[in-house]
UniProtKB/Swiss-Prot annotation:
It comes from Burkholderia lata (strain ATCC 17760 / DSM 23089 / LMG 22485 / NCIMB 9086 / R18194 / 383). GO terms for molecular function: ATP binding; histidine-tRNA ligase activity. CDD domains: HisRS-like_core, HisRS_anticodon. The keyword Calcium does not apply. This is Histidine--tRNA ligase. Belongs to the class-II aminoacyl-tRNA synthetase family. The gene is hisS. Pfam families: HGTP_anticodon, tRNA-synt_His. Coiled coil: none annotated. Keywords: Aminoacyl-tRNA synthetase, ATP-binding, Cytoplasm, Ligase, Nucleotide-binding, Protein biosynthesis. InterPro entries: aa-tRNA-synth_II, aa-tRNA-synth_II/BPL/LPL, Anticodon-bd, Anticodon-bd_dom_sf, His-tRNA-ligase, HisRS-like_core, HisRS/HisZ, HisRS_anticodon. One of its GO terms (biological process) is histidyl-tRNA aminoacylation.
């Protein structure tokens, strides 16, 4: 009796957690290089924290009645020691934890930045994923509105550096704790009048986090939210002066903004300044960067009272904007593709490829897909398809004569098939290639 060959099930990735494929990696690298250059220009230092933290960090830091903590965190119990752990849903709390644990603020304020994956258990949709990537800054130890203005200015400069347009700034002030408490009383009184028409989400938040009701996306509740008591009307002199100082600095730097009284953010640690950069090009997920001031957080997590502000931006959303506006850079090919025919030629080609890499050139050495020798024709097709600027050709005849063939490909500009193959001494190969690439680049600039 013969057994039927059992079909092996094809495995796929987790829904909402996406692979970054080679054809997209160039765009990621372009964005990362651009943002890192900007962060250096502002004196920010990189910090890297673990993906997994103690769950308590987020329940204390973000707030127990926030959507993130209540229903979006990937949390689990460590089978080894029973610790409650969570895959980070955001990184501000982790950066603050690290700054306290390692006493980073002992010698004064710090400007820190991070980049990496975050995790939230929510319904995947355009611009919203279960694993997503953020870059963010945390300015720890700065209390004035100038720090708020500077981190906002950084975002504007990044949009300019990337060539992005149509991203608009909205700002608000959440004031101080006592001002929010006074506003909360009046807000609950106001919302209670509409208890019979509030949706389930708003009813759930009414007594736990009523400020978030103002941020509702339900069309039926927009008028109620619009007419609700505004927190900005409850600000005291200190909060008002801080907010006005921020506005003056933004205007002085020609940064247009809109004051949005309903902008409250979804994390409990914010006070005073909050802001969002929004676009209408991404549908419902229009926020591409957001942040503000979180002065209470460092003390709340066990540190000394320290002012702080920062922002985070969703990398996937920004990359989508770059594609939407046709700003994605062309993927660059390598400099050289080395082809060969014959055993001796293969050995010499292998050595030459390494020597070319020693000089800083990017080189692909042709390796057979099936282990059998490939024809020059098939190798040259691969070379042209690779995007390389030049093919370096090793045959038995060339090796015997101490020469190689060099042919410009499409990656060097023009029609690769019509370019003439040249014979070059092996000893002069590197110099020839460098001169040829310089000439090709100059022709491309004309």
């Amino acid at each position: 009796m013969t057994e039927q060959k059992r079909k092996i099930e094809k495995l796929t990735g987790v829904k909402g957690m996406n692979d970054i494929l080679p054809q997209d990696a160039g765009l990621w690298e372009f964005f990362e290089a651009t943002v890192k250059s900007l962060l250096r220009a502002y004196g920010y230092q990189n910090i890297r924290t673990p993906i997994v933290e103690h769950t308590q960090l987020f329940t204390r830091g973000i707030g127990e009645v926030t959507d993130i903590v209540e229903k979006e965190m990937y949390s689990f119990t460590d089978a080894l020691n029973g610790e409650n752990l969570t895959m980070r849903p955001e990184n501000t709390a982790a950066v603050v934890r690290a700054s306290i644990e390692h006493n980073m603020l002992y010698d004064g304020p710090k400007r820190l930045w991070y980049i990496g994956p975050m995790f939230r258990h929510e319904r995947p949709q355009r611009g919203r994923y279960r694993q997503f990537h953020q870059v963010g800054v945390e300015a720890l130890g700065f209390a004035g509105p100038d720090a708020d203005a500077e981190i906002i200015m950084m975002c504007q400069r990044l949009w300019d550096d990337l060539g992005l347009t149509g991203i608009k700034l909205e700002i608000n002030s959440l004031g101080l704790a006592e001002e929010r408490a006074a506003h909360r009383v009046e807000l609950i009184k106001y919302l209670e009048q509409f208890a019979d028409v509030l949706d389930e989400d708003a009813k759930r938040r009414l007594y736990t986090n009523p400020l978030r009701v103002l941020d509702t996306k339900n069309p039926a509740l927009q008028e109620i939210a619009q007419n609700a008591p505004k927190l900005i009307d409850f600000l005291g002199d200190e909060s008002r002066a801080h907010f006005e100082g921020l506005q003056r600095l933004l205007l002085a730097n020609n940064i247009p903004f809109k004051i949005n009284p309903r902008l409250v953010r979804g994390l409990d640690y914010y006070n005073l300044t909050v802001f969002e950069w929004v676009t209408d090009k991404l549908g419902a997920q229009g926020t591409v960067a957001a942040g503000g001031r979180y002065d209470p957080l460092i003390e709340q997590l066990g540190g000394k009272p320290t002012a702080a502000c920062g922002w985070a931006m969703g990398i996937e959303r920004i990359l989508e904007l770059l594609k939407e506006d046709d700003l994605a850079p062309e993927q660059e090919g390598v400099d050289v593709y080395v082809v060969h025919q014959g055993e001796t030629a293969r050995e010499q080609a292998f050595i030459a490829a390494e020597r070319l890499r020693d000089t800083g050139l990017d080189v692909i050495f042709h390796c057979s897909a099936d282990g059998a020798p490939a024809s020059f024709k098939s190798q040259m097709k691969r070379a042209d398809a690779s995007g390389a600027a030049f093919a370096v050709i090793f045959g038995e005849e060339e090796v015997a004569n101490g020469t190689v063939g060099v042919k410009a490909l499409r990656g060097a500009g023009g029609d690769g098939e019509k370019n003439v193959q040249q014979t070059v001494p092996v000893e002069g190969l590197t110099e020839f290639l460098i001169n040829a690439m310089v000439a090709s680049a100059e022709d491309g600039d004309d």
